[in-house]
């Protein structure tokens, strides 16, 4: 599933394919942008912010913006979120597209040297670049961004000491980029139960620092591994391994719902911790 490293990699794919080029055509297949034509627009750069992808463009002088706004000469951002199932793919002109149903395509961007296709994208919006904060300003420090600040991430998490550490790591307002895979793997490696209250976690700084290290290690490759192995079936310690033996102690890995997501953990290596004491 797309997590911060996947979105970072996707942004680099679009950067290589489109940055510095002028679009020769566009096709939006979502109601809010159905009438938008980006032909002649210049792609400046592709960037990621947590799980959000930002494609920044400049409209040619005299070109109307979305819904008749004044767009000419202005900088705009095409925002998309991959959530659980979205993806961008870049192809050479004439290359056969991936075998995905056509009804999943949300946008097609064409330049002289590349075709970028967005599948099952969410929160697709075209906004002035100077208004990006309206879409990503709520996010915590980006684990793969220049603003990464473990102290700030810890401060945000510690503000809700009763929240479970499993849910706190997934809350993008605390730190941006962790998804379910990294949540499960980080907590296993730290020996912390996902149900532990944030206020009872012995070393929050160590926890978020490990999360950043794991995501950073997977930048530039599509196979996500936390074990050091890229072999099929050997890339995770607990995630996706329900009922299989723990790689450390041999106990069967468990799977259970935590909040709105499932979590995987080893009941021996990640023992339950006592709840916070009352006032």
At which residue positions do the language-model features occur?
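Structured catalytic/nucleic-acid-binding cores of DNA maintenance enzymes
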Residues: 1-279
């Amino acid at each position: 599933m797309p997590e911060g490293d996947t979105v970072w990699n996707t942004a680099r794919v679009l950067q290589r394919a489109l940055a510095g080029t002028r679009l020769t055509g566009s096709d939006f297949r979502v109601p809010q942008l159905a009438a938008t034509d980006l032909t002649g627009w210049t792609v400046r750069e592709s960037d990621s912010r947590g799980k959000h992808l930002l494609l920044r463009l400049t409209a040619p002088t005299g070109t109307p913006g979305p819904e008749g706004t004044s767009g000419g000469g202005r900088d705009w951002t095409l925002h998309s979120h991959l959530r659980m199932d979205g993806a961008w793919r870049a192809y050479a002109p004439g290359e056969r597209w991936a075998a995905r149903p056509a009804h999943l395509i949300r946008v097609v961007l064409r330049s002289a040297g590349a075709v970028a296709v967005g599948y099952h994208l969410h929160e697709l919006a075209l906004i002035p670049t100077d208004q990006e904060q309206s879409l990503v300003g709520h996010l915590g420090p980006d684990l793969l961004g220049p603003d990464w600040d473990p102290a700030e991430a810890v401060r945000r998490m510690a503000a809700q000491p009763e929240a479970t550490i499993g849910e706190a790591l997934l809350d993008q307002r605390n730190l941006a980029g962790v998804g379910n895979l990294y949540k499960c793997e980080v907590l296993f490696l730290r020996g912390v139960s996902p149900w532990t209250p944030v206020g009872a976690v012995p070393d929050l700084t160590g926890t978020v620092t490990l999360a950043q290290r794991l995501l950073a290690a997977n930048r530039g490759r599509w196979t996500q591994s936390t074990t050091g192995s890229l072999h099929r079936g050997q890339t995770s310690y607990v995630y996706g391994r329900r009922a299989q033996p723990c790689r450390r102690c041999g106990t069967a890995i468990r799977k259970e719902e935590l909040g709105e997501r499932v979590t995987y953990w080893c009941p021996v290596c990640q023992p339950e911790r006592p709840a916070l004491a009352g006032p």
